[in-house]
């Protein structure tokens, strides 16, 4: 299948080492670096998940003209991902998150980023999406709040996708869910749900009410709230469903939402019901949170759970 992936492209950097003493200059640990690892992050982690699940992925987003964007392009090529639909903006800085780690614990995260929104970039991205929409099977929006997923861009994307009866899946960010109106499915986590729903989220009924509120308020057909160790709550426009999580060891939740939305959209578009696709996505998420760092699922790993 062919998938359009729209979102904020991020380079993840992991600097690992040992801490054996405190700095004499300030009461902070000294990290003796032993390893550095650069991986595709943000929406590009969704691209990796989609590719590993057998999709051809059209990754659409913005990077700066800098060394970090060169690294992203090289990593994409190594992963078998197409790079030709990415806009290189001389006025932007490629988003990069550097995590400093000792004994599998994060000490600090350093972010380098600049909002990538401009009308010119918006027009370029819209043109790319329109040129690809007829050859795609589904669209996935991975919003990390860095500026790519603007209201106008998503309005045009959802409009032309709906005209072609192509499902749009949303992994949201922030409190402006209006820009996701008329999408097919949205997959907020608890924090993202609280950004738009100001009532308690404790019981299953609370989560059911939140799902229906999101669908009714923003004219979205289906909603899946990911609840961490408590699994998922699903509203499929008619019924509510709850899926339990059997996760045992959680080392890192980074990228779990990426894996959920990639697996869900892939299997649902293949023909699985939304509930069955969500169950498979839940299993995929349980696997990736047992690993450290931004790690995508692959088909062989997923098959071992099915």
Residue ranges and their predicted role:
Residues 1-20:
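Positively charged, low-complexity intrinsically disordered leader regions
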Residues 135-148:
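Short acidic, glycine-rich surface-loop motifs adjacent to enzyme active sites
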Residues 3, 24, 28-95, 305:
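Substrate-binding N-lobe of the ribokinase-like
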């Amino acid at each position: 299948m062919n998938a359009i992936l729209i979102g904020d492209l991020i380079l993840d950097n992991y600097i690992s080492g040992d801490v054996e003493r405190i700095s004499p200059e300030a009461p902070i640990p000294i990290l003796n670096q032993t390893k550095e690892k650069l991986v595709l992050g943000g929406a590009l982690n969704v691209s990796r998940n989609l590719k590993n699940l057998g999709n051809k992925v059209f990754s659409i987003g913005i990077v700066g003209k800098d060394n970090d964007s060169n690294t992203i392009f090289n990593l994409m090529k190594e992963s078998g991902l197409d790079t030709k639909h990415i806009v290189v903006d001389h006025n932007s800085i490629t988003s990069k998150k550097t995590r400093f780690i000792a004994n599998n614990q994060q000490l600090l995260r350093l972010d380098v980023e600049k909002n990538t929104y401009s009308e010119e970039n918006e027009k370029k991205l819209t043109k790319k999406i329109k040129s690809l929409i007829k050859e795609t099977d589904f669209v996935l929006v991975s919003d990390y709040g860095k500026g790519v997923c603007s209201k106008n861009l998503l309005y045009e994307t959802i409009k032309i996708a709906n005209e072609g009866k192509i499902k749009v899946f949303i992994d949201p960010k922030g409190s402006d869910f209006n820009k996701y109106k008329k999408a097919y499915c949205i997959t907020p986590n608890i924090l993202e749900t609280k950004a738009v729903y100001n009532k308690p989220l404790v019981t299953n009924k609370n989560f059911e009410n939140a799902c229906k509120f999101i669908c009714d308020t923003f004219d979205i057909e289906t909603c899946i709230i990911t609840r961490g160790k408590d699994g998922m709550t699903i509203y499929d426009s008619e019924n509510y469903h709850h899926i339990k999580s059997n996760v045992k060891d959680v080392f890192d939740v980074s990228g779990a939402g990426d894996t959920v939305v990639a697996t869900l959209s892939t299997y649902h578009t293949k023909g699985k019901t939304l509930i069955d696709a969500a169950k498979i996505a839940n299993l995929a998420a349980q696997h990736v949170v047992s690993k450290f760092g931004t790690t995508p699922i692959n088909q062989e790993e997923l098959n071992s759970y099915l």
